[in-house]
Amino acid sequence: LAGFARAGQDGARATAGYYSKAGREEKGIVKASFFTGVIGGVLWYVLIYYWAAIDFSSEQIGLMGGIGSAVSVITYLFGGYLADAIGRKKLFLVGLGCTIAGLLLFLTEKNLAVFTVGYALTSLGGSLEWPSLTTLLVAKTKPADMKFLYGVQGFVNQIGLTIATFLGFVGPPIMEDLLGPETLTGFKLVFLATTICAFVPIIYVLGVKETERKPSSLRAHFNKRTRRILFMYSFQNALIGFGAALVIPWLPVIFNRSLGASDMWVGMIITLSNAVIAVGWFVVPKFAEFRGSVTLIAVCQIASVAPLILLPYSPALIVVAVLYTVRSFLMLVPQPVLNAYVMNITVEEIRASFLSLSQLAWQAAFAGSYVIAGYLWANDYTKPEPFYYAGALYVAASLIFFAYFRRIKESHELAPAIT
């Protein structure tokens, strides 16, 4: 325990020290990540809560979420290729434009078709933004330091997400009490503020210089070994995506409808979880040096299943808050280490393509599972079974990840580097 505590302190110092020495462009990308975190917080947590508040059924919510997510599946087929071919910065800006267009549609009156198109646009935007921004960071640091850059980027992104989710849940009822408008009007103001925030990353990303690369055949870099790595990573990613859609997007509604949490409580539970994740992302990179990135990721993901399964049996909201926070911490905190690991086992020329194709597997499974989940819940958010299904898929994916990738070394651990 003392060793882990020291590693946590060392991790925080190392991450902060790295950022203090970072250049203007790295800091610009990190600052842009704050605002993409705001967008992500509203779309991931607040949106489905809003849909439930305006009386969409679970089947309709599943349909909107599934169709919207399916659109991003199509985008992931060519998004990574475009990022590698025409530039990550240009594609990020295109994705941001799609996200803004989708957010504007949520300002309209309740309409299943319009909201489905809106969610499709935001999903499309996210599928272009994420691999582009992630790979923009890679060229700004050495492989061995990458986890620290992703750590601070994840920390800042999570701070934006935390603020957005808290205000997204708590803001509308407070505005109703203080100013008089309906709560639903408050939700629309949340979407309006999010739309404004979506313009800010443009300022930071335009200032980033992207190294021009000579055109080359991407297929030449996808050799047999790389294709095998891509398949295994995508397969376990799909299992996690399928499990996630069964439960995770529905949790705010479950907290409210099944466990009796008010809007304020829902906001506090999710805010606490996100704040802890933010701190974790700042300190966790150093922990990878204990047993390696793969072991850290697999152990944390498997450990997250127990608190997830216990959630529907919670006797009090404070227990819900603790279990949800522990689950989120264990499942999500290793993400910067995972991002750095994936970047370090692929070559520069195909990194965006690799990320897009592997995320395609996650998103395709997530989209199909989202629709299934709507019928599985059937407007009864007291069921424990979806938690068991999700937990089983998480464990299976984590075991597959560990069994295969514990043999795959990162580029800075090899001499010569992976080619």
Per-range role (PLM):
Residues 63-81, 271-283:
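Central cavity-lining transmembrane alpha-helices of secondary-active solute carriers
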Residues 90-105, 295-310, 388:
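Structural signature of the two symmetry-related core transmembrane helices
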Residues 151-172, 361-370:
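Glycine-rich segments within core transmembrane alpha-helices of 12-TM secondary carriers
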Residues 195-214, 400-405:
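C-terminal membrane-cytosol helix-exit motif in multi-pass small-molecule transporters
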